Structures are given as structure tokens and as C-alpha cells.
Amino acid sequence: MTGKKMQRGFRLALCAAAIGACMSSAMAAQVPPGTALADKQEIVRHIKDEPASLDPIKAVGLPEAQLARDLFEGLVNQDANGKVIPGVATRWQTSDNQTYIFYLRKDARWSNGDPVTAKDFVYSWQRLVEPKNLSPFAWFAQLAGIQNAEQIISGKLPADRLGVSAPDDYTLKVQLDKPVPYFVSLTANFSLFPVNKAVVEKYGNDWTKVGNLVGNGAFKLQE
């Protein structure tokens, strides 16, 4: 990815073959009546600065955040009015604002066809707070109140002690240190987006390169 290419724009190709899996019909874009769509659906986003990384936990500014939202999808999204709407999670529940249960879509897919599961979120959130990963956004897990995040970030506990678990492939349980009534809205933050464990472990620091990156968003990296 050259600086010259970045100045022209950052090209993302629509996951046409997997769009039905990437987004449920309820989440599909609403096209205004009378609007003619181009045969080739793609977005070319011009950004001022080259992104430091396409890894959600390495994002440090607006360029990375914009691209992360194109390439990945979290538990929830926000509509044009800022209202929380389903993302990978179809619904959620809590009785005390301290323990949250999220129920995931069974048709959610990574761009390589693998299913997106609750275990992907467990891995990704643990990866966020793992001190060795030096995430500039690790503090967000602490801000969100996820159980043990502070102790893990400071190196006092291992990452697998984070208050997140997967009772089954499509159920995610989150335990907080204290009640946080607005926690669901916080999961729309890019730092809590899932990543594909197999791809990250296979390619290491090169997992975000063109040809390697696997996302679960509406768009995939092309060049």
C-alpha cells in the first residue's frame, strides 16, 4: 500500500458473494425510491493520512476507525440518529446492568466463509487487554467496566481472566465490575470488534495485509 495510492483513496470492495451473510435483511441499506444503483457496488474513501494499522486494537485515530467500521462489525451498530441497533448480536438482555448476555446471529460470516462465533469475541477482547499487544485502546475495556480489565492491563492478571465468556457458539456473556446501564452502546466501539483468531495466528503482524485480512463487515480490503 503506497502513499500515492492512499492519496487517491482507499479502495474497499463490497463482499458481494457474502453480503447476505455479512448483513441480515433487517440491517440492509435502505435505498431511496427511484435511486438507481451502479452495477458494481464499491466505496472509495479518501482519507487525509495513511492509517497506522487496520487492526481494530491498533487504531489510534479517525482514519483507522473509519476503515475498521467498513471492514468489521461489532455486537451492535448505531443508526444515523445514534440509536443502538443490532449488529452481530440480534438481541441482548440484562437484569442488573452488570451481567449482559448477547445472542449472536447464526448467519454471521467472516469474509472467508467461516462463521462468526462468541468465541471470536472472547478472543478479540482478551487480545485487546493483553499487555503484550500494546493496544493504545486497551483502556476502553477498563472504561466499559469489563471485569478484571484494569488488573489485566496492568499485568496483575492473565488475559483469560477478563469477564467475557462463551457458553456456546452463539451466546456471549459479559461480566462487569459494577453496573453500567449504557454498556450495550459501548460495544459499538471499534476496539471491541471481533477478529479472526486463525488468521491472526497464521500471519502474525502481517494479518492485516491485502490478501491476508479477513473481516466480518460489509466490505473487504481490495488494494
Where are these regions (language model features)?
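Gram-negative bacterial Sec-dependent N-terminal signal peptides
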Residues: T2-M27
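Hydrophobic residues in beta-strands and at strand termini
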Residues: I47, T94, Y103-R105, A166, ...
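Extracytoplasmic/secreted proteins, especially bacterial periplasmic and envelope-associated proteins
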Residues: Q66-D70, K83, G87, Y103, ...
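Aromatic- and charge-enriched surface segment that lines or borders ligand/interaction sites
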Residues: R91-W139, K173
